[in-house]
Amino acid sequence: MPKKKPAKHSGEDDITIPVSPQTGSSIDTWWWLTHKGTTTSFLCISLFALLIRSAVTMYPYSGAGIPPKFGDFEAQRHWMEITTNLPVIDWYRNGTYNDLTYWGLDYPPLTAYQSYIHGIFLRFFNPESVALLSSRGHESYLGKLLMRWTVLSSDAFIFFPAALFFVLVYHRNRTRGGKSEVAWHIAMILLNPCLILIDHGHFQYNCISLGLTVGAIAAVLCESEVLTCVLFSLALSHKQMSAYFAPAFFSHLLGKCLRRKSPILSVIKLGIAVIVTFVIFWWPYVHSLDDFLMVLSRLAPFERGIYEDYVANFWCTTSILIKWKNLFTTQSLKSISLAATILASLPSMVQQILSPSNEGFLYGLLNSSMAFYLFSFQVHEKSILMPFLSATLLALKLPDHFSHLTYYALFSMFPLLCRDKLLIPYLTLSFLFTVIYHSPGNHHAIQKTDVSFFSFKNFPGYVFLLRTHFFISVVLHVLYLTIKPPQKYPFLFEALIMILCFSYFIMFAFYTNYTQWTLSSHFGSSDKEKKQI
């Protein structure tokens, strides 16, 4: 039987969790569930989060009523049309009924399978919405309603359970914590304003790949490494942008394997889990090298250039002074961006290979995804969802920095959301996040105890710089909405917004990389050296 530690009466919300002699035992998780009331908190917050998502769906989506190609909504609908009417081998192949220049599939097979399942659902209730060829640009009320419901259901059945899995494991490893702290953390994850606006406003299914990633992260924390490999392989098979997290998973798992009696066997076991998962879900395309390469070519549209539109990363921001596209060929830019991304990811990877820990792994996820966002090839505004998800999971460790990152992550997508006519949801969710973030609880005290190594606040002028940044951002909000830019510089305000957001992101990246290297090794049982077979 697990031994319960004596309760400490430091506050009515503080609870001491019994420690199971076996890591990952269901005993301590069940005790935690029944004594902390997490189920009630999670259900209440989940219902509220679904209500907010439903409210956002009432607003326009990407490309609404704008022919000939409309936007991401039409892309997702078109993929349902293709997958429900054509053989699986033709889903990625250009042909009479599948014109790849009109929203051809450019995500891995799991996205195609998801489109097929959702397409069957749409065809049952509204066959016209997925009829081959004739359904292009379909925007009936029922069709839009069904499409919105597919995103809501994906969120509810994939992202929400994954979030609960993570919260259970994460707070079980934290030997003390209050109900309000746990509820606040759940709210920060489920009421992620960036994800809500992109999936339920703009219209995408990021909740699926991010949900699988969160599940894989939770599996790491409870030391289920094979499950980690399976879930993360599924995330990669749904959206290739999940590769933003790959350096963190690779370095952490490799670091743990190297500390065991049989490191090679450990690596082989995990490698088999990855290979089997990929083979199963890529099965229709692994029989022929040509078919396999055909799918891969759709996943890497290098011809679009190193960046698209205005994104707050290094390449777009510096292009104001350095015309990258004019100075270098696409092939050269691919090599340069790859080298820059590897160099930016390397410090956090080395730290986890040398000293793998649960907390270091969470920081590694944040640092590798931010490195990809800042320096990789063909980054979109929506790609900020990757590092922002990692920061959300670390919200209790970085409460102040997390609030600032949320603001600038939202602001970096402001022009995109305005084009989609999502200004009201943008302002409403920003306000809602601020209210919930400042809700009663003890989360602000966490920073003093858990992240005490280094802070920008120790630098003279930091507070002034932060306030100046914020003031400029408010001015840019107003200018963007009220003043027409000069004809000579039609995207002036977008460029200024990107410069401002990039300047914050790069400071944040330096801070989190430094913090990862100065972590103590008290978080979780996996931080201790173990010799396993």
From Swiss-Prot:
| Molecular function terms from GO | dolichyl pyrophosphate Man9GlcNAc2 alpha-1,3-glucosyltransferase activity
Q: Write the record's keywords in alphabetical order, separated by commas.
A: Endoplasmic reticulum, Glycosyltransferase, Membrane, Transferase, Transmembrane, Transmembrane helix
Q: Which domain of life is it from?
A: Eukaryota
Please name the Pfam families in this protein's record: Alg6_Alg8
TM helices/strands, residue ranges: 42-64, 149-169, 184-204, 214-234, 264-284, 360-380, 422-442, 463-483, 491-511
One GO cellular component term, please give it. Answer: endoplasmic reticulum membrane
Question: What Enzyme Commission number(s) appear in the record?
Answer: 2.4.1.267
What InterPro entries does the record tag this protein with? Glyco_trans_ALG6/ALG8 (IPR004856)
Q: Which PANTHER family match?
A: DOLICHYL GLYCOSYLTRANSFERASE, DOLICHYL PYROPHOSPHATE MAN9GLCNAC2 ALPHA-1,3-GLUCOSYLTRANSFERASE
Q: Please identify the protein, giving its name as recorded.
A: Probable dolichyl pyrophosphate Man9GlcNAc2 alpha-1,3-glucosyltransferase
Provenance organism: Arabidopsis thaliana
